[in-house]
Amino acid sequence: MPWVLRGLRDGILTSEWPRGGDHYFDGFDAAVGVRTDADDGEPVPRAVADAAAACPTAAITTDPRPQLDRGRCILCGRCMTRAPQWFAWEPGCGTAALTRRTLVVGQVDETDEALSALRTTLARRVRRLRRCVHIRHVDAGSDGSDEWEIYALTNPVYDLHRLGIFFTASPRHADILLATGIGTAGMTEPLRRTFDAMPAPKVVIAAGTDAISGGLIGGGYTGDVGIADLVDVEVWVPGAPASPFSLMHAILLALGRLPQNSKAKR
């Protein structure tokens, strides 16, 4: 009985995003940003060089200008400690991208025309999936943190089911392959078999830094440096781990269902 009274007291907790705004989606620090006003040929400040040397995943490069690869970034914050004038948290969970190179910030962005054409091509492929979509999740060597965020998608706050999106245990019923982990040797074949068993049209989302680049532990004797060499990836969502809202952003980006005012020049 107490939980009934508590539920009545709390009211509706489910987010209104994407139909409405959500302060957590807009205000959560889901990525690291870098200054883009540096000129080519300008000497790299010592602080930036120190930040690049301190980055545990080599996500920062300085030639010809300071750049940060969000696909490698684990959000440790070392760069912001060493070079706060150059690196800072960037609020907003709209971090997913349709191309791997778009995750590199501090460089010249792709043209709007190229990005629009890519989004149109993907939307044309998945237009039949918009109403009822099923996701098959495969853990290809994750540290477990990505899975906690994925599980949160079905809780009352995010409630992915309200959008007509569900998880399935069968790849034959799946429209989206949501892959996490570095691509360990033991999961290479199961991941490929899952992909091959899915009917067309299908979309692959690389969820988290491990799936994109291998993160901290990729490239060793146990596995690969992400899943891109194993299956064709259409959507990349960075984060260590990616937040539930970032995962939702990636799924809706793949389906062409993002709101028009979404912060997604991807």
Region roles according to the model:
Residues 34, 46-103:
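Iron-sulfur cluster-binding cysteine motifs and their immediate structural context
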Residues 17, 30, 37, 70, ...:
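Fold-independent oxyanion-binding glycine-rich loops
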Residues 237-266:
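A charged, well-structured terminal subsegment
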Residues 127, 143, 196, 200, ...:
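Generic secondary-structure signature for well-ordered alpha-helical cores
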Residues 148-150, 155, 164-246:
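Cofactor-cradling patches in redox/metallo enzymes
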Residues 49-58, 71-82, 136-151, 209-216, ...:
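Local cysteine-cluster metal-coordination motifs and their immediate loop/turn environment
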Residues 1-54, 58:
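Ferredoxin-type iron-sulfur electron-transfer modules and their immediate structural context
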Residues 1-15, 44, 78-164:
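Flanking helices and flexible, charged tails adjoining ferredoxin-like Fe-S electron-transfer domains
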